[in-house]
Amino acid sequence: FVGSNNELTSQYSVRGGSYDENLIYVNDFEVFRPYLVRSGQQEGLSFINPEMVKGISFYNGGFQAKYGDKLSSVLDIQYKKPKKFGGSAYVSILEQGLQVEGVNKNSKFSYLLGVRNRSNRNLLSRQDTKGNYVPSSADFQALLNYQFSPKWQAELLSNISQTKFTLIPEFSQLTTSVFSPLYSATIGVDIYFEGREKDRYQTNMLGFSLINQPSKKLKLKWMASRFENDEAENVDIIGTYLFGDRDFDKRNPTYGLIVNPLGAGVYQNWARNELNIENWNVSHKGNYDKG
């Protein structure tokens, strides 16, 4: 079973596992997502650019040892190797993107470039918590390949991504109904906010691989990569709330208001989180096809 609990997120769980138990590879390089993200509204673009993808392999268990020791799943992405000049572009309310690919005259050098920009402000503004949402996310990816000879080639994969999220909440109105043989009521909570949240997530990735294919059956690949996450969260929000019975009789002038207060209070959400991760990896992979 593969599922997600939020339509705003690219996180997914497999067979009840956590999202961080899933491995993701792009052209044999392991990629990571921001670590401090706590909700879908903070997320930006996922690492994978669909316009650059050639093939996808997904294993929800029982995968080969070459993929490592994570518990739940493996998502193995292979990007395209262009054979001619081309490209694509798309524009939507939430996201815009441009992809360009091509080769040189002797077909030894190929490039695959992609740039995306996303803002889901229109979607977030329809949530229960009303306020000023300012999300933005952009990334640039490049895959460069050079064929030295029929047996040797080099590949460079790079990604630069930045996501910013600012929220100045104003008001939230929540309602739930309680039914029982002894008591039934419509309980509401009105929350008034002051303060703001400001987050930033910067991701940089650079991977280099040298590929040697001595024969049709044997393929050797040396890889080196660097992955960096620079994240910061700044939250200082005070909420004043009132809860009680909400009036849903449209004939009354108090329609939609709390008419029988049961309690009130104040809470504060405060955070100063910073995280910087730098991951270097050097590896070698070999593949021999007996067929």
Where are each of the predicted segments found?
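Short sequence motifs at beta-strands and strand-loop junctions characteristic
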Residues: 4-6, 67, 90-92, 132-136, ...
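Extracytoplasmic loops and strand-loop junctions of Gram-negative outer membrane beta-barrel proteins
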Residues: 37-41, 58-59, 80-83, 124-128, ...
